[in-house]
């Protein structure tokens, strides 16, 4: 099965299914000498793991990561890093009622059309459970970026349904179960999620992530633009249906004199571009947003078909997130870190000796 690897110089390959015995990742390209431990990875995994609040899936997975290779005496060796997380709370019987039907809005139908077969237990390989390994691999990239290069990655969920963040305090996102930067909206979010659970339904969300301290010059021309890789990274996350870089789709209503990020010797006057110009980092804050659809795993009956094309009605049982965006922030941050470290290594490989004609202006 192709499509299980991401990155060029810093590459992560994941494996495993939602209801299989374990999930795993192979991380290639991490420079040697980086101090790293299972505890470093666990901090990020604990932010993503299921069952941590009553507003997410009640599947309880400890998501305890094991480093199998590539680390010796607390430092990366420069060789392949092997990571493993065991699944411990599968309830495959919850999915026996959909073994012969396709859940509308899920990958059941398309996987069967592609492979002629599917793992119906929790979505198998198409489950968001896979993203645990992205977070583990991304934690390695994140620590390198922070420790070696001083790059700070952060983000949060800025909208769930019609509840929007009106103030943005990114230092508070880990203080509430929604990763929401506007704590005044938390009661409204609690009411919304409780109502969705009562109705057996779900809702979409918007997640935004940022990177401060990225120097100018990262990214490759044309097909390997850094914003193109960011878009691919975010679109590869389950349920993501749209990605914005900088002002994104708002540029439709902007005039040229509004959108262009004017420059002075003292720095940029705006950041509509989201820190990327011509596919190459500008030195400004990188800003990426994504829209996540409402999950189709709901208790409201829906029309579908069976394995032989016959009409069927589907009700999805099991333990599911009423809003998948609630746990998406650590995943998006991890993918941002992976893209940035990959492009840092690519840039260093070709352009390490390049000296620009003048110092970069402040972002």
UniProtKB/Swiss-Prot annotation:
Claim: Signal is one of the keywords in the record: no
Cofactor annotation: FMNH2
Catalyzed reactions per annotation: 5-O-(1-carboxyvinyl)-3-phosphoshikimate = chorismate + phosphate
Record's keyword terms, sorted: Amino-acid biosynthesis, Aromatic amino acid biosynthesis, FAD, Flavoprotein, FMN, Lyase, NADP
Function statement: This reaction introduces a second double bond into the aromatic ring system.
Annotated NCBIfam families: aroC, PRK05382.1
Stated family: Belongs to the chorismate synthase family.
Assembly description: Homotetramer.
PANTHER family cross-referenced by the UniProt entry: CHORISMATE SYNTHASE (PTHR21085:SF0)
Name of this chain's protein: Chorismate synthase
Species per Swiss-Prot/TrEMBL record: Alcanivorax borkumensis (strain ATCC 700651 / DSM 11573 / NCIMB 13689 / SK2)
């Amino acid at each position: 099965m192709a499509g299980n690897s991401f990155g060029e110089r810093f590459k992560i390959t994941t494996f495993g299914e939602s209801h299989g015995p374990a999930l795993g990742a192979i991380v290639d390209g991490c420079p040697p000498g980086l101090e790293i431990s299972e505890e470093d990875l666990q901090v990020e995994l604990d932010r993503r793991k299921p069952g941590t609040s009553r507003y997410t899936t009640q599947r309880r997975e400890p998501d305890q990561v094991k480093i199998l290779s590539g680390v010796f005496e607390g430092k990366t060796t420069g060789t392949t890093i092997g990571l493993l997380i065991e699944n411990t709370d599968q309830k495959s019987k919850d999915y026996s009622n959909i073994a012969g039907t396709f859940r509308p809005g899920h990958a059941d139908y398309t996987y069967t059309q592609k492979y002629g077969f599917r793992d119906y237990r929790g979505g198998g390989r198409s489950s968001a459970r896979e993203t645990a390994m992205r977070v583990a691999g991304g934690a390695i990239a994140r620590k390198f970026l922070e420790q070696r290069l001083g790059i700070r990655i952060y983000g949060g969920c800025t909208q769930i349904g019609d509840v929007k963040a009106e103030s943005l305090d990114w230092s508070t996102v880990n203080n509430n179960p929604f990763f929401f930067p506007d704590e005044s909206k938390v009661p409204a979010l609690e009411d919304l999620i409780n109502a969705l659970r009562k109705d057996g339904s779900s809702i979409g969300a918007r997640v935004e992530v940022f990177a401060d301290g990225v120097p100018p010059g990262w990214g490759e021309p044309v097909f390997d633009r850094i914003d193109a890789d960011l878009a691919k990274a975010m679109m590869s996350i389950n349920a993501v249906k749209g990605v914005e870089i900088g002002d994104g789709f708002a540029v439709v209503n902007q005039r040229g004199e509004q959108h262009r990020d004017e420059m002075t010797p003292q720095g940029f006057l705006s950041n509509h571009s989201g820190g990327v110009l011509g596919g190459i980092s500008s030195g400004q804050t990188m800003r990426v947003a994504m829209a996540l659809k409402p999950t189709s795993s709901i208790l409201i009956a829906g029309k579908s078909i069976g394995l032989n094309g016959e009409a069927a009605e589907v009700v999805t049982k099991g333990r599911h997130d009423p809003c998948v965006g609630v746990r998406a922030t650590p995943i998006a941050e991890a993918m941002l870190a992976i893209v940035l470290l990959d492009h840092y290594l690519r840039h260093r490989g070709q352009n390490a000796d390049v000296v620009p004609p003048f110092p970069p202006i402040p972002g």
